[in-house]
Amino acid sequence: MKFLVDVHAHTIASTHAYSTVHDYLAVAKEKGIKLFAITDHGPDMADAPHFWHFVNMRVLPRIVDGIGVLRGIEANIKNENGDIDFFGSYLNELDIVLAGFHEPVFQPSTQTTHTQALVNCIESGNVDIISHPGNPAYPIDIKRVAEVAATHNVALEINNSSFLTSRKGSLKNCTAIARAVKEAGGYLVLGSDSHVAFSLGGFDKAIELIQEVDFPIERILNHSPKALLEFLTSRGHKGMDEYAEIV
């Protein structure tokens, strides 16, 4: 099983990451990756890029040397209301919006608080994908979140980095999330959460998990460029036709 689309990658604009857009393009070419998203951390993170970084992503070509580049963000969920740190008409200019919990912005609290924050964030309509929802530092009502996400056409991420260097102890939660999303009829997406270009498209542990739960591949959004682009179009994102040559 091979996935040639990655929705979650950070550049040196997030200064705890170590690669440029050019670095990612080189690795994508080497690995045969067809489409990937640049999703630097939202501006409320201490070392995140300025708000204008995201506004100016319009200068990025959507296709470079046959590789699609999505203009995105991994926004920070700020509070129980589900607010994120990027807003207004600027959201509509991005191709893909991830959002998740990060300790410097939203300190871990109770399961009830975390669950309500995710539900409100999903229901806001501002977010396409919830990033690393299996983080054990932020326990949630998995069944409820999966059902709300399915109802509102929002995907939950199985984050490969959570099984390697970050968010230790995520496997049990992520397995439960995959089972709950399968039951609810919703979507998953696999993300490398790459902070260095070498790990772009690295999904080995996430693939093991989805195989274990027998998750239907047609409901894993990055199983093909077409599937992800059709999902983003259904979410109201414009410009997806510009990627026609890679579909």
Swiss-Prot record:
- Might you give the EC number(s) for this enzyme? 3.1.3.-
Q: Which top EC class applies here? A: hydrolase
Could you tell me which Gene3D superfamilies the record lists for this protein? Answer: Metal-dependent hydrolases
PANTHER family from the entry? PHOSPHATASE YCDX-RELATED (PTHR36928:SF1)
Q: Which SMART domains match?
A: POLIIIAc
Which of this chain's residues are annotated to bind Zn(2+) 3? E74, H102, H132
Gene Ontology biological process terms, A to Z: bacterial-type flagellum-dependent swarming motility
What the record notes about the co-factor is: Binds 3 Zn(2+) ions per subunit.
Matching InterPro entries: Phosphatase_YcdX_put, PHP_dom, PHP_phosphatase, Pol/His_phosphatase_N, Pol/histidinol_Pase-like
Q: Which residues bind Zn(2+) 1?
A: H8, H10, E74, D193
HAMAP family tied to this protein? YcdX_phosphat
Any one GO MF term held by the record is: zinc ion binding
- Which family is this sequence assigned to? Belongs to the PHP family.
Q: Which residues bind Zn(2+) 2?
A: H16, H41, H195
Query: Can you name this protein?
Result: Probable phosphatase Shew_1420
